[in-house]
Amino acid sequence: MGMIAGIDLGTTFSALAILNKIGRPEVVPNSEGERLTPSVVYFDEDQDATVRVGIEALNCRQLNPDRAIRWIKRHMGDSQWRKTFGERVWTPEEISSLILKKLKQDAEMIYPNIQHVVISVPAHFDEVRRKATMDAGAMAGLNVIGIVNEPVAAALYYATTHDVNGRVLVYDLGGGTFDVTIMDVSGQNIQIVCNQGDHALGGVDFDRKILQMFEKTYQEQTGQPLITNSQEQAQYEDEAEDVKKTLSRRPVAKKILYGKAGSARVEITQAQFEEAVEPLV
């Protein structure tokens, strides 16, 4: 029997893991040597719309953000979502399959015998989204033998390293989706009590609150908008994420904003950020 891998097909990052020789989970590094692969796909402007996936796609996004696809997980199972590049129309499942294919191909450089996969999904995913995830795996050439709820996967891993018995709450706020699950755990036996979530709430929405603060500050200081095109949008989305990370470590983040009307200085405190995101939490 071939090796079984577990895949976290995330909104912002994805990863593939296997059980190593001593039975411990091990995240397999990608071809860039990183354990996390950005869930980004970029289509070149050539006639064939050459596809780039992962960090390469993320870097190319600054060149032409309109040809980059991010956060595709939010559209899984949406029959109305379509994007055209070159002469081909792409569905969310087909975009996701490109990410899954890269994960598998990169992992097979180290473990060439991966034949089956289990893919984790948000607990609140309905059957349409779950089937779409399995379809994406099949398009990537994977034999998807199972779908597991992300909070259950987290609890299973925790149970392998800790003595857990009782009722457990798993709070899973990811890059683009949110789950809260209550479960009864006894060793590695898990029974779901209830779960709730939002497939359109995650870290990216916190970034957007900071982006709004950027825009407000810049307009107050210059009288002009900060963001006027998709390239500037992409640039400041990344800078907003950097500020969010800074505020997780420090009480204040400072940045100079450069726009067509000149520069503006912005300072955001943890308290200001918490107030801005309070409606989300």
Regions of interest found by a model, annotated:
Residues 1-75, 79, 84-89, 108-281:
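Oxyanion-binding/catalytic loops of NTP- or PPi-dependent enzymes
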Residues 97-106:
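Short, well-ordered amphipathic alpha-helical segments that serve as non-catalytic structural scaffolds
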